[in-house]
């Protein structure tokens, strides 16, 4: 067995004993094996031979080196340039292809590393004359500083932050200065010839008025009409120039907001009646009035449509397509809006009918065989939808309308007419054949009260239920009952209104003499529904008519209360006795017996024969006709037409109910309808359609209902007192009737509110002061009722 020769390994894996070492280092040490070993001993071969001597005796056991041997090794630590090249080749072979990029720059890196190694060799080749055996004592450890307080730490932190901010500021200044040096000074600002300014306090009188008018028109709604109308009259329209600009603003608003055209037409009528006339700018010319300037604007807009149409047709370029569409849309809005405004002005008696016929002839054209433009056909349909009913009321205009509609029927058969226009013309013909009653409700501007009333009808709620929601009476939450009140509300006694301990709430069902539930409505007085209130027990049955209930809104299991019944035969509570109807003369008070226990067959309420004989039956459908004509009057406010409709009813015994319904509807709509209400009642009294007894009984009817109505309409007592006072001033109502109206209600709060409003309105007029002084006894009696 041969013994392996000890070979010193200067690198990992070196030596000749292993396959790795032979593969990697055999080529690299081939030079040394050939006998040229001077590259390992630059300082001579003596030291190297000594190293070889002790390496020959080296075994595989642990080797211990003496101090002298280590010092001998230090003498051969100089690394030559050839060894460094070998190092690079070995590392490249170890790392493989990943380090192939190193070889491309091997020359540059080799030079850099060579310089670094030479500097390190120069430092280590110097003779070290220090005494390694002598040990110097370590310097004493510095004393441990005392623990820093939080204040000291905070001060150091603040100083550090301050220095950082200063350094950042200096860097920013240096950066900005360098940028300025590179870019140069910023460009100078270009000032406009006429710079914008707020011009506060420098407005002219005309600009100030126009600015005020614009603000008023932007806030104008049917509910705020009366208030803003007064502000517009007081805005300062003092010259003809200002008047023309104001009319232009109103015209533009009305044209682009056709839904509000009725409101703007009414505004124009009010301004025409109240604004002054101005002298003509030309000698011998006509006066400048609101009506003349407004009609000139309408005429110019109507006649200028052809020039706009030609201008739009000239836009044929591909880049003008968007502009053409915008102008077509604006042209259509202006045309239809102008036609709608002219129609509404006709309703306000500001446009004569001859102008209307001239417009229709212009739109239809003289040639019956030619097909009008689509815009003209749509304008004709819009025109007749607005004023067709009013034109047909005049026999002469109706004959002219017949010729128009003959032309329209021929137009439907024209193949050149577009399908859309054909359907519009057919709808117009059907509308006239149906007496101008539309199939769908017309979309128009409404007040908040009208919106709530419509919602109550659609949902089957008790009248005024939405007012309770607005006032927060259902704040605790929970489902709503058909009367508009919370089912889970404390104190209501649950779902069953007749349970013991339940509170009587407005709108809850009452009980008749046989313990049958009777659904109460706003028109029913408080207490027992069969209990008389003076002369009120004999009034129209609509007072006691239950309000409709939508069965879909009721909880499950309650359908039997309002559905078909084997006992009743019909849905709902039992009908009231037929003898309880409207009567022109009050009946004596009747006492009601105590409630009888409920039985399978409800007993009829005994009514005296005298009451049955004196009762008169009201024609069916009279209530709906009354509500319809009152709604129409408050919409158009034409007194003669309202008078004609009431006279056509031919029911003088129903006049007190009409008075009551008129007051109820007007006060429910708001304070702006008090004046039209008083004008209507005064007009009907002056024309002898209504008598003094009709007005007194109607006010008495409404006064008996005010305790229920006042819950939803807190201002109703004050407004009702104003109506009474104004009727007294017009001699339509006797002052003694005030005492009877106050006695019809039990709540002293409502009595006081009504009488205070009556006296306040009368004291503001000299004639009213004379009435109060001449009826001192009645005033004292009314004061005692209000305490």
Swiss-Prot record:
Gene Ontology molecular-function annotations: mRNA binding; translation initiation factor activity
Compositionally biased residues, Low complexity: 112-121, 588-604
Protein name in the entry: Eukaryotic translation initiation factor isoform 4G-2
Residue span, MIF4G domain: 210-435
Record GO biological process: regulation of translation; translational initiation
Species whose genome carries this gene: Triticum aestivum
Keywords recorded for this protein, A-Z: Initiation factor, Protein biosynthesis, Translation regulation
Subunit and interaction comment: EIF4F is a multi-subunit complex, the composition of which varies with external and internal environmental conditions. It is composed of at least EIF4A, EIF4E and EIF4G. In higher plants two isoforms of EIF4F have been identified, named isoform EIF4F and isoform EIF(iso)4F. Isoform EIF4F has subunits p220 and p26, whereas isoform EIF(iso)4F has subunits p82 and p28. Two forms of p82 have been identified, p82-34 and p82-16.
Gene3D superfamilies according to UniProt: 1.25.40.180
Sequence ranges of Polar residues compositional bias: 160-181, 532-547
Residues covered by the MI domain: 621-743
Lineage, uppermost ranks: Eukaryota, Viridiplantae, Streptophyta, Embryophyta, Tracheophyta
Pfam family, one: MA3
Protein origin, superkingdom: Eukaryota
């Amino acid at each position: 067995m041969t013994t392996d020769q000890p070979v010193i390994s200067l690198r990992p894996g070196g030596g000749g004993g292993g396959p790795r070492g032979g593969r990697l280092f055999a080529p690299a040490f081939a030079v040394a094996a050939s006998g040229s070993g001077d590259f390992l001993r630059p300082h001579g071969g003596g030291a190297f031979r000594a190293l070889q001597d002790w390496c020959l005796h080296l075994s595989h056991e642990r080797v211990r080196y003496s101090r002298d041997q280590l010092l001998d090794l230090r003498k051969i630590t100089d690394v030559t340039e050839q060894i460094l090249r070998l190092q690079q080749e070995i590392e490249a072979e170890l790392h493989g292809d990943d380090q192939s990029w190193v070889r491309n720059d091997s020359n540059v890196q080799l030079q850099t590393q060579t310089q670094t190694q030479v500097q390190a060799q120069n430092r280590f080749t110097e003779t070290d004359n220090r005494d390694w055996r002598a040990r110097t004592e370590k310097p004493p450890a510095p004393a441990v500083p005392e623990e820093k307080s939080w204040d000291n730490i905070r001060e150091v932190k603040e100083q550090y932050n301050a220095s950082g901010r200063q350094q950042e500021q200096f860097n920013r200044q240096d950066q900005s200065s360098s940028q300025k040096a590179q870019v140069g000074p910023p460009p100078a600002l270009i000032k406009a010839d006429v710079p914008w300014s707020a011009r506060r306090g420098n407005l002219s009188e005309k600009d100030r008025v126009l600015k005020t008018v614009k603000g008023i028109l932007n806030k104008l709604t049917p509910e705020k009409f009366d208030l803003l109308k007064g502000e517009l009259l007081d805005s300062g329209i003092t010259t003809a120039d200002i008047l023309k600009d104001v009319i232009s603003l109103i015209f533009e608003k009305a044209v682009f907001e056709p839904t509000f055209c009725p409101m703007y037409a009414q505004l124009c009528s009010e301004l025409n009646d109240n604004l002054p006339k101005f002298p003509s700018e030309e000698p011998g010319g006509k006066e400048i009035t609101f009506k003349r300037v407004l009609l000139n604007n309408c005429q110019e807009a109507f006649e200028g449509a052809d020039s706009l149409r030609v201008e739009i047709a000239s836009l044929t370029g591909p880049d003008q397509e968007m502009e053409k569409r915008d102008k077509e849309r604006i042209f259509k809005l202006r045309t239809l809006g102008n036609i709608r405004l002219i129609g509404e002005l006709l309703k306000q008696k500001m446009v004569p009918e001859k102008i209307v016929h001239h417009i229709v002839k212009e739109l239809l054209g003289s040639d019956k065989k030619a097909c009008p433009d689509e815009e003209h056909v749509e304008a004709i349909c819009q025109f007749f939808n607005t004023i067709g009913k009013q034109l047909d009321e005049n026999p002469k205009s109706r004959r002219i309308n017949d010729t128009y509609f003959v032309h329209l029927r021929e137009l439907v058969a024209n193949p050149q007419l577009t399908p859309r226009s054909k359907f519009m013309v057919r709808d117009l013909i059907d509308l006239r054949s149906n007496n101008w009653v539309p199939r769908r409700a017309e979309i128009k501007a409404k007040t908040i009260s009208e919106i709530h009333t419509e919602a109550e009808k659609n949902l089957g709620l008790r009248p005024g239920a939405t007012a309770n929601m607005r006032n927060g009476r259902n704040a605790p939450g929970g489902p709503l009952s058909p009367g508009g009140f919370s089912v889970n509300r404390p104190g209501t006694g649950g779902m069953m209104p007749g349970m013991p301990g339940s509170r009587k709430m407005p709108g809850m069902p009452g009980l008749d003499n046989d313990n049958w539930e009777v659904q109460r409505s706003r028109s029913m007085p408080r207490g027992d529904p069969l209990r008389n209130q003076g002369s009120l027990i004999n009034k129209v049955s609509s007072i006691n008519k239950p309000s409709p209930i939508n069965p879909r809104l009721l909880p499950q299991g309650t359908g039997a209360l309002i559905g078909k019944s084997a006992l009743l035969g019909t849905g709902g509570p039992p009908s009231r006795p037929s003898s309880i109807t409207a009567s022109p003369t009050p009946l004596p008070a009747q006492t009601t017996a105590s409630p009888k226990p409920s039985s399978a067959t409800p007993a009829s309420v005994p009514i005296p024969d005298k009451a049955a004989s004196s009762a008169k039956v009201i024609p069916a459908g009279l209530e709906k006709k009354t509500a319809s004509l009152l709604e129409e009057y408050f919409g158009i406010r034409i007194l003669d037409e309202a008078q004609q409709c009431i006279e056509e009813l031919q029911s003088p015994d129903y006049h007190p109910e009409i008075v009551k319904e008129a007051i109820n509807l007007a006060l429910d709509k708001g304070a702006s309808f008090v004046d039209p209400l008083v004008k209507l009642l005064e007009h009907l009294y002056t024309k002898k359609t209504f008598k003094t007894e009709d007005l007194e009984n109607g006010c008495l009817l409404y006064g008996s209902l005010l305790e229920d109505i006042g819950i939803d309409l807190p201002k109703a007592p004050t407004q009702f007192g104003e109506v009474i006072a104004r009727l007294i001033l017009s001699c339509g109502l006797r002052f003694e009737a005030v005492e009877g109206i106050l006695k019809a209600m039990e709540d002293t709060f409502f009595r006081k509110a009504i009488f205070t409003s009556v006296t306040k309105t009368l004291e503001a007029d000299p004639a009213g002061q004379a009435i109060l002084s001449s009826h001192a006894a009645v005033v004292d009696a009314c004061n005692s009722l209000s305490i």
